[in-house]
């Protein structure tokens, strides 16, 4: 009897949540269309590092910040604990012109959507309305594989001044990961508050441009350009490609085609443990 009462209460709770969610959807959708371009003439950029807790890379922060500051941006850095669902909802209001995201990403085969991970561990009791509407999803990152020499000597093949790979056999170690909340294109469309002001997005994570769903949602929200990966990518290649993109795009001021060509030359899929291409999606 107790279980039946509890079940009825839970069903009632979910029904009420759906009604509240519907009202919230309408309110947020209307509010989300408000523009937010009050930047006082200051160029602002941000590095959003969802990976930092599990895969820290302070030298990446330092170098990326240096490139952005040299290009005239004031730079903020947010790490795993800051990267929440609510953080992403408010992102357009923060008035960033250049947004670099270091993150786990994946594509949801069921909905044909790309999703970006937050730093929030998944719980079915949180973000109930967002889960019901498919604006956030449960996602598990690809297991990290740590490579180590299987023999006493390493056999490295030098490709160029900045890239080399190991030819001999390696031993692998798998590292378990948690489930996280991930944001979908529907969250960008429905729940982000404000508009981006011709913002450039660098989406550094697996499959962030495996299909254009997430990039298109950012473009519709006011972004001008989105770059990312068309497939799974190793962390070391991800970090190198992002830094090369910032160098060639901001410092050398190459156009997009030449910038991506330079990245392809230096981070060539032929030599990557997970072959992937750094590509872009622009406003038409």
PLM regions and their residue ranges:
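N-terminal Sec-pathway targeting helices
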Residues: 2-17
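Active-site-proximal C-terminal subdomain of hydrolase catalytic domains
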Residues: 199-284
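Short amphipathic alpha-helical segments and helix-helix/interface helices
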Residues: 65, 88-89, 188-193, 215-216, ...
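Extracytoplasmic/periplasmic, Sec-exported soluble proteins
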Residues: 52-60, 91, 179-184, 193, ...
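Cysteine protease catalytic core and zymogen-processing segment of caspase-like enzymes
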Residues: 108-226
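Hydrophobic single-pass membrane-insertion segments
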Residues: 24-34
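Hydrophobic core
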Residues: 18-22
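A domain-level signal for caspase-like cysteine endopeptidase catalytic cores
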Residues: 32-155, 162
């Amino acid at each position: 009897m107790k279980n039946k009462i509890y079940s009825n209460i839970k069903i009632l709770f979910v029904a009420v949540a759906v009604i509240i969610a519907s009202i919230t959807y309408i309110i947020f959708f209307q509010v989300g269309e408000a523009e937010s371009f009050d930047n006082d003439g200051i160029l602002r950029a941000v590095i959003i590092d969802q990976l930092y807790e599990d895969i820290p890379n302070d030298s990446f922060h330092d170098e990326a910040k240096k490139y952005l500051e040299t290009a005239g941006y004031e730079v903020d850095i947010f790490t795993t604990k800051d990267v929440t669902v609510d953080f992403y909802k408010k992102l357009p209001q923060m008035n960033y012109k250049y947004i670099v995201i270091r993150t786990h990403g994946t594509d949801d085969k069921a909905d044909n959507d790309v999703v970006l991970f937050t730093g929030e561990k998944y719980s079915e009791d949180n973000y109930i309305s967002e889960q019901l509407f498919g604006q956030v999803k449960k996602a598990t990152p690809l297991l990290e594989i740590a490579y180590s020499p299987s023999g006493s000597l390493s056999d490295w093949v030098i490709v160029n001044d900045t890239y080399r790979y190991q030819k001999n056999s390696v031993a692998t170690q798998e590292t378990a990961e948690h489930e996280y909340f991930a944001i979908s294109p529907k969250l960008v469309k429905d729940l982000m508050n404000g508009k981006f002001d011709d913002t450039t997005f660098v989406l550094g994570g697996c499959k962030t441009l495996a299909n254009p769903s997430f990039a298109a949602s950012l473009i519709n929200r006011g972004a001008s350009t989105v770059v990312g990966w068309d497939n799974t990518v190793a962390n070391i290649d991800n970090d190198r490609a992002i830094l090369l993109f910032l160098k060639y795009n901001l410092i050398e001021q190459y156009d997009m085609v030449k910038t991506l060509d330079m990245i392809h030359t230096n981070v060539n899929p032929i030599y990557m443990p997970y072959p992937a291409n750094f590509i872009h999606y622009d406003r038409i």
